[in-house]
Amino acid sequence: MIFAALLTGCAALPDTSPEQVALPYVHTFSANTASNNLPTGWRPWGVNRFKRPTEYRLIQEDGRTIVRARATASASGLIHPLDLDPSVYRLLHWHWKVDELIAKADNTQKHTEDSPVRLVISFDGDMEKLDFGDRMFFDQVKAFTGQQLPYATLMYIWENRAAKGTVIANRHSSRIKMVVAESGREKLGAWQEQTHDIYADFRRAFGEEPGRITAIGIMTDTDNTGENVHAYYGDITFKRIARPRSVVDGD
């Protein structure tokens, strides 16, 4: 998938609706009903008009509302604008479930860069720090789409082979990195709970301090491999790291 076109959705978010205003929290999927077309606070996030979109639908499972994604040689997502300090809200917590892997997917290769589930987080930053190659790439994206890429993008993915914790550099830009949150077939078909220190992961991936978080997205994509996949997303939340209690606190 050409992330250049897709990720512009993280940068230039319209502010014509209350649901599209950057917030200091994420609207939960479970607060919705399955009859809603889209979860509150989220909007469609497309690649381009020539790409088939992935289908996202709110459904009920075991009494809670979740998002089901169905990809058929497709790529698109849902995005939620944010305004968060990752040094304060360091912990990113979510649930996801994958029924089957994408057999041909390999995120280390640009022609097979698909994943059954992705969490995509965009960060603000000083564009003057971009190197020449990234400046050229960002300029090309802006010329093609009319929108500006975020300064940095960090993804959490489910990979076929790469080990958990591996950081994979995007083949198009050094400002897009993928962290392997889950790998292989062992945990297919069951809900998986994930918690990651996004502040630490950003520093490990980019070698610098993160700027403010400007958006989060979910994405299931199979446009490169042409395969079919179903996946499920539960609530996504950002949390503070609990401060250890001390004698001074009275405990």
Segments from the language model and where they lie:
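Short carbohydrate-recognition loop motifs
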Residues: T54-S76
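Extracellular beta-strand ligand-recognition surfaces/modules
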Residues: V117-L119, S174-G184, L188-G226
